[in-house]
């Protein structure tokens, strides 16, 4: 097993949605070691082509806003288990 853990990044604020927070969160993600990050995000126009270009997995929920619901919590836990994540980051505190 690698000495580098894997982190699940949960966020509403991720490109291709425009904005400064979105760019900041993306920059955090792309600067992580290869294989160490998985992103769970909401959808935005152009997400499929954007995600295909990323050097890490991006899992999109079928919504434009992730809300702190039991279903989202279950899905995040499922993704963390499936990808062997040992840490979770939240891209922005609200609304998650």
Name each model-derived stretch:
Residues 74-84:
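Short, well-structured alpha-helical segments in soluble
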Residues 11-18, 24-68:
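N-terminal strand-loop element at the rim of the active site
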Residues 90-96:
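Short His-centered aromatic/hydrophobic patch
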Residues 2-7:
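Extreme N-terminal starter segment of soluble prokaryotic enzymes
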């Amino acid at each position: 097993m690698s000495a580098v853990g894997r982190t699940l990044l949960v966020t509403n604020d991720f490109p291709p949605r425009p904005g400064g927070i979105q760019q900041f969160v993306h920059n955090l993600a792309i600067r992580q070691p290869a294989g160490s990050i998985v992103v769970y995000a909401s959808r935005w126009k152009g997400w499929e082509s954007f995600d295909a270009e990323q050097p890490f997995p991006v899992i999109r929920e079928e919504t434009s806003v992730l809300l702190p619901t039991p279903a989202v919590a279950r899905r995040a836990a499922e993704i963390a288990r499936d990808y062997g994540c040992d840490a979770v980051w939240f891209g922005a505190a609200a609304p998650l």
